[in-house]
Amino acid sequence: MSDVRSVVVAGSRFGQFYAAGVAADPRFVLRGILGQGSRRSRALAERLGVETWCEVEALPDDVRLACVAVGGAARGEQGPALAEALMARGIDVLIEHPLLPREWQDLLRSAERLGRRCLLNTFYPQLPAVARFIELGRQLHRRRGIRHLDAACGVQVGFATLDILAALLEGVGPWSLESPSNDLSAMRGLSLVLAEVPLSLLVLNELAAADDGRMTLLQRVSLTTDRGTLSLLSPHGP
């Protein structure tokens, strides 16, 4: 029996990166793109030489995994409902962040009820530069102890940034959060403690109405030990 798994990708905007990754991995076969019949979806499918579908019910029976690159309520999209419909078809789901807490809780309950797997993908910790920063940061933390963390991010990648910090510290508890200040701009400062390490977090709390992918700030993380500072200036390096 072949170990290669058949995969569909839902969404063609950010989904194009999932589709390219699946198509390049010999462990998977990309069966097609699940979308709304847009020109972009059709063009992506044509470029990759796969099919397109507009309904979950139309998917082939051999599909075992779906990558849902469709947002949730925070973006006015129906990604969680789509993920639940896919699990009801017997398909495991990898869904893109961010989701509201209630959306994620509901999906976990549905996955348990339906006997499926559902994973929330924060994406950034797997990027090569970020993964290397996490690896080096863990080594420093184990040997010297991190004395302080500084992080800055756009609100769109807030959850992913916290996931990077959790991976770096190998946990989050015990944790605490001070009430945020009433800042005079969209830059909001937060003071936290994660895993007994103090953290200063700056979040650009705004979205462009016409393009939620436009960000003037993505991610920066710095850690300080008694021997110096290690910084990640961008998730793409250095």
Where does each model-flagged region fall?
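Short loop/edge segments at beta-strand edges and connector loops
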Residues: C54, I95, L120-T122, S179
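Short, aromatic/basic amphipathic alpha-helical patches
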Residues: V22, R42-L48, D106-S110, L162-L168
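Contiguous beta-strand/loop segments that form the cofactor/metal-binding neighborhood of enzyme cores
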Residues: F159-P238
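Beta-loop-alpha module in the N-terminal Rossmann-like domain of NAD(P)-dependent dehydrogenases
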Residues: L48-S110
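Structural motif
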Residues: A10-R13, L34-G37, A69-G72, E96-P98, ...
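Short, surface-exposed connector motifs at secondary-structure boundaries
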Residues: A23-V29, A88-V93, L114-R117, R144-G145
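A contiguous active-site-proximal alpha/beta segment in oxidoreductase catalytic domains
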Residues: L100-I164
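N-terminal Rossmann-like dinucleotide-binding module
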Residues: M1-L48
